[in-house]
Amino acid sequence: MSEEKNYELWLDNYFFKPNFWQKCLAFILLPLSVFYAFFAILNTFFRKKIVFKKPVISVGNLSFGGNGKTPLCKAIAREFDGVFIVLRGYKRKSKGLFVVKNQNEILCTLTQSGDEAMEYAFEENIKGVIVSEDRVKGIEKAFELGAKIVVLDDAFSKFHIKKFDILLESKIKPYFNFTLPSGAYRLPKFYEKRADFIALEGRDFVRYSFVKENPKAVLVTAIAKPFRLYEHFIKARACYFFKDHYEFKKEELENLLKKHNCDTLMLTFKDFVKVKDFGFKCQIIELNIELKDSLREKIKTYIKEFEQ
């Protein structure tokens, strides 16, 4: 078992199903969580509210790690025309604003965009993708390029932007209702009251995940909360988990395939965009979300406000 796999599984256990010693550690770190929460709350005040003349929708979550924001953003883009995605571009090797995609043309490299932005760029229904640390500048650029709707990936905490906030509520909740580092929350849990819509799996959207069993495949992934792929672990000969946004090396993947006498990598699309030029045979784990009427109609109602 690799160090990366140990690290990811330890974090998953610590935040969601801690053992006795991990619970003790969480309480030892509680003073740090109080300081973290204080400064996180301060950061949400004292900024002038910015209002746009077109719809801005945010998809976010309170807890650390992935909850399905990317598939939900894609689902919104499939339902509505003219969607641009604006995101920070976490772990990219660039600074400032980059137009990753504009009207079906990819305009930058993976190192400039980051893996999540490039995953969005390959989605046909998404008309544009922009990465920017400054979300306001990213939104302005998107509308300048012709966006009808801007969807912000992971921007719930950007309370200075007037937007429709969709907060994803995971089926698997953190063990403690503490902020980091004692718990998995990035903002105190009471902040969920500031959401315009709390989206619950099963009630407001349905998640689909599919891949065929392949005994000649090694499942490799670098996503947050890899246990989300649990149902697929038995479909490959071996599984390896790396840190979220990990930059794969061709040689290490070759060694994993040789070690298990396999010829195929089983990956999510987010992982695939980082290895597509390596020349490996790949099998994609399909991760999709379908909106239910409760969420779809709320979004439609919000968008119609701008048509008046």
Curated annotation (Swiss-Prot):
Binding sites annotated in the UniProt record for ATP: S63, F64, G65, G66, N67, G68, K69, T70
The reaction(s) this protein catalyses: a lipid A disaccharide + ATP = a lipid IVA + ADP + H(+)
GO biological process, one term: lipopolysaccharide core region biosynthetic process
Enzyme type, top EC level: transferase
Listed pathway(s): Glycolipid biosynthesis; lipid IV(A) biosynthesis; lipid IV(A) from (3R)-3-hydroxytetradecanoyl-[acyl-carrier-protein] and UDP-N-acetyl-alpha-D-glucosamine: step 6/6
GO MF terms held by the record: ATP binding; tetraacyldisaccharide 4'-kinase activity
Key words of the record: ATP-binding, Kinase, Lipid A biosynthesis, Lipid biosynthesis, Lipid metabolism, Nucleotide-binding, Transferase
GO CC, any one term: plasma membrane
Enzyme Commission number(s) of this protein: 2.7.1.130
Superkingdom, natural source: Bacteria
Pfam families the record matches: LpxK
PANTHER family assigned to the protein according to its UniProt record, in alphabetical order: TETRAACYLDISACCHARIDE 4'-KINASE, TETRAACYLDISACCHARIDE 4'-KINASE, MITOCHONDRIAL-RELATED
Protein role: Transfers the gamma-phosphate of ATP to the 4'-position of a tetraacyldisaccharide 1-phosphate intermediate (termed DS-1-P) to form tetraacyldisaccharide 1,4'-bis-phosphate (lipid IVA).
Family affiliation: Belongs to the LpxK family.
Entry protein name: Tetraacyldisaccharide 4'-kinase
Organism annotation: Campylobacter jejuni subsp. jejuni serotype O:6 (strain 81116 / NCTC 11828)
Gene transcribed to yield this protein: lpxK
